[in-house]
């Protein structure tokens, strides 16, 4: 039983596609080595000291999950309304050596997310830290382009940057968000927090 559980954990919603480490939440269907796997459902994790190794940087979407992120042990949740992706690198630079090992970014909801924005955030995080970028679920003209930028940027920075596919999660769980297709209902906030913690734990 222990071995079976260990295998399931290692199979935790990780798919390698075109050089991109793609992380999606439990309960989803993922492709691993060409084989479709249905990841088992899992309850929200209990508060964990590992959360202190994570900082999250985001906008109003992340702000809607702040109460769960903090409850689940993530000590630093830096999220404000209307934040643009261009602000990300400056926020990371201000924290400097105080940044934890894992940086989670959810920006681009409110406008353009450029390749320069992405590269600047990875550089600002420093060479020893991992940066996780959530894809966007925002029914606006810039959604597809921003998500493509995120995926391409991550593919160009293997081992340092990772994609957490929030867009796919919202497609799978449309009731996680309100009628605007973007902001989180309580169930979505819980799924959002769980997804981030599991992605960080599963990344190599």
Where does each model-flagged region fall?
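Sec-dependent N-terminal signal peptides
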Residues: 8-30
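A short helix->loop->beta-strand "cap" motif at the edges of active sites that frequently abuts
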Residues: 127-131
């Amino acid at each position: 039983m222990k071995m079976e559980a260990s295998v399931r954990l290692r199979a935790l919603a990780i798919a390698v596609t075109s050089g991109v480490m793609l992380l999606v939440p439990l309960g989803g269907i993922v492709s691993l080595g060409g084989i479709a796997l249905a990841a088992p459902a899992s309850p929200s994790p209990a508060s964990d000291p590992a959360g202190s190794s994570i900082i999250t940087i985001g906008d109003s979407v992340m702000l809607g999950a702040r109460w769960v992120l903090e409850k689940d042990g993530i000590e630093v949740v830096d999220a404000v309304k209307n934040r643009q992706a261009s602000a990300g690198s400056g926020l990371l630079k201000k924290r400097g050596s105080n940044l934890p090992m894992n940086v989670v970014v959810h920006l681009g909801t409110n406008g353009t997310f450029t390749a320069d924005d992405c590269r600047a955030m990875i550089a600002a995080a420093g060479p020893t830290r991992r940066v996780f970028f959530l894809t966007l679920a925002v029914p606006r003209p810039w959604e597809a382009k921003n998500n493509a930028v995120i995926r391409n940027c991550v593919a160009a920075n293997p081992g340092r940057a990772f994609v957490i596919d929030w867009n796919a999660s919202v497609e799978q769980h449309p009731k996680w968000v309100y009628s605007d297709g973007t902001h989180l209902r309580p169930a979505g906030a819980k799924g959002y927090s769980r997804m981030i913690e599991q992605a960080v734990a599963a990344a190599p």
